[in-house]
Design a protein with these regions (language model features):
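Alpha-helical, largely C-terminal catalytic domains
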Residues: 134
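Glycine-rich acyl-CoA binding loop
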Residues: 127
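Conserved GNAT acetyl-CoA-binding A-motif
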Residues: 140-150
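GNAT-family acyltransferases
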Residues: 1-124, 137, 141, 182-184
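Conserved beta-strand-loop-alpha-helix junction that forms the acyl-donor binding cleft
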Residues: 149-159
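Conserved active-site tyrosine of GNAT-family acetyltransferases
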Residues: 162
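Conserved catalytic-core motifs of GNAT/GCN5-like acyltransferases
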Residues: 168-183
Length: 185
């Protein structure tokens, strides 16, 4: 390389990653599978009803009744830009959900988001395992090389969870979104 050659990044495999799809990811404490509104919405409603705080930093919710909640879950199941997965405990009860989103196969970059865990799932071995199973699927099966976690800068619990799971803090996206009429960094 001559002195006139600017520095550039390392050569990488430019083969695009695969788009996520329907998959069942089994673990020791539970299972992650593609969201199915008809099977999962009733248990998710039972686990999350009255837990308004879990929706504080997310665009949807809280939901006043099961009909409105089921409509949201059904729309999430049909979403082709954000692929939603359900977390099931070993008794096959749906106790949370999340999505793979901001999917950029050509760059091999994907984000986990829309993380909604019922209180029974929060800070448990299953919550950690579910995140691990989804990340492993993204890296090892689909071929992504970057797996992102973004959250509201004010969501201390989400920031702690990201750090505990091994994500590296890279900064704050100022005025990134408007959620429920409020600025979200």
């Amino acid at each position: 390389m001559s002195e006139d050659t600017p520095p550039v990044g390392p050569v990488v495999d430019a083969t695009p990653a695969q788009f996520p799809g329907a998959v069942t990811l089994g673990g020791r404490f539970g299972t992650v599978e593609r969201l199915d509104a008809s099977r999962h919405a009733p248990a998710l409603w039972t686990a999350m009803r009255g837990q308004d705080a879990i929706w504080s930093y997310l665009p949807p919710g809280p939901f006043a009744d099961p009909t409105t909640f089921n409509t949201y879950i059904a729309a999430s199941e049909q979403n082709q830009e954000r692929i939603f997965y359900t977390v099931l405990d070993n008794d096959r009860r749906a106790v949370g959900f999340f999505s793979l989103m901001e999917i950029r196969p050509a760059m091999r970059v994907i984000e986990v988001g829309n993380v909604v865990y019922a209180p029974a799932l929060q800070r448990t071995p299953l919550s950690t395992e579910a995140q691990y199973l989804l990340a492993r699927y993204a890296f090892e099966t689909l071929g992504y090389r970057r797996y992102e976690w973004k959250c509201n800068a004010l969501n201390a619990a989400s920031r702690r969870a990201a750090a505990r799971l091994g994500f590296t803090f890279e900064g704050i996206f100022r005025q990134h979104m408007i959620v429920k009429g409020r600025s979200r960094d």
